[in-house]
Amino acid sequence: MKRLLGTFALVTGGSSGIGAACARALAAEGAGVLACSRRLRDGGPHGDAPVRVPNLGEVSLAHLDVADEAEVRQRFGELPELDLVVCAAGVGTFGPIVNASVAELREMLEVHVVGTLVCAREALRRMQLRRKGHIVMIGSHVVNEAFTECASYTAAKMGQLGLARVLAEEARPFNIRVTSLLAGATDTPIWDDRPGFDRSKMMKPETLASFLVSIVTRPEMSVEEVVIRPPAGAL
């Protein structure tokens, strides 16, 4: 039996990596999924079709820059109902602090903090009306452990986690759950420019997507923060 039949989800960062895996996993359980990314064009990678409300069990594609308030409002209004939002949009550049770029830091804050805030706000506004829903934020284990060359990324992810904690308290009276999945090393395109790491020891995006499905289909409990790491630990 498909556990999410009759529900609608919006996934940011849905063109690749964890976001794309989550979109596929949710659709496999019967959800209608609108997968969004600033790398996508409306209706598909070539922009040759309008945004289509997804049928149950299907994924529709749409462009979305999560830091663009007007576009976020538009996208959130395109689903007939909104049961689940997965904030998986992310960007990361890495290097020692002595070489840190303020422009790159600002971009990461725009995506991970501003973008998450805007998406969470629009999700909460809609979910409050029905007094139910679930917002999942794909965070990072860097909030718990210091890694060299990750200062700007860590700052952005810590901001996102702080936002999620406050959101969880504000959403609770409306029966809306908020979850932060603090992911360890996962084999996604964020590692493409970082040679020297053994990606065979990393988790696959599908592993996190499977875990996400296991918690969003359990309305009798609220998983608010959880660290998910590969068996090898920090890589």
Show which residues each predicted segment covers.
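C-terminal helical subdomain
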Residues: 173-176, 180, 197-235
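Substrate-binding pocket helix/loop in short-chain dehydrogenase/reductase
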Residues: 96-97, 104-106
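Conserved glycine-rich cofactor-binding loop
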Residues: 15-16
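Active-site-adjacent segment of SDR/Rossmann-fold oxidoreductases
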Residues: 145, 166-176
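Active-site helix of classical SDR
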Residues: 120, 156
